[in-house]
Amino acid sequence: MDEKEFAKICKALGDENRVKILKMLTAGELCACRILEEFSITQSTLSHHMKILSDCNLVSVRKDGKWSYYSINCKTFSEFKNVISEISCEKNTKSECSCK
């Protein structure tokens, strides 16, 4: 995962509704209508949120006729988690500045 993809995911996660949607999807695949039941938003607003989550590959969408079913993309989350681990403070050690 490159920095651009990572930043795009961080931006997507910056909205509490999208975080709530992702938490709902941890239970498994859900129809858009089921997700919508949990929010006080319009269908078009939900579609906007789902497009953002889908565009950065956090969720996968499966179409069945007029219905859309969403699920978490575990591969993307695994890669995102790896990048978070790479920039963790746990590995931070003091080093001498070379410009002295």
What are these regions (language model features)?
Residues 2-5, 74-100:
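Amphipathic alpha-helical dimerization/coiled-coil segments
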Residues 11, 20-23, 54, 60, ...:
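A cross-family signal for key residues in well-ordered alpha-helices
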Residues 23, 47-49, 66:
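Base-recognition residues in the alpha-helical recognition helix of bacterial helix-turn-helix
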Residues 4-11, 15-42, 68-76:
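N-terminal helix-turn-helix DNA-binding core of bacterial DNA-binding proteins
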Residues 55-64, 71:
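Beta-hairpin "wing" of winged helix-turn-helix
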Residues 37, 54-55:
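Alpha-helical residues within the helix-turn-helix
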Residues 46, 53, 70:
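Divalent metal-coordination and catalytic microenvironments
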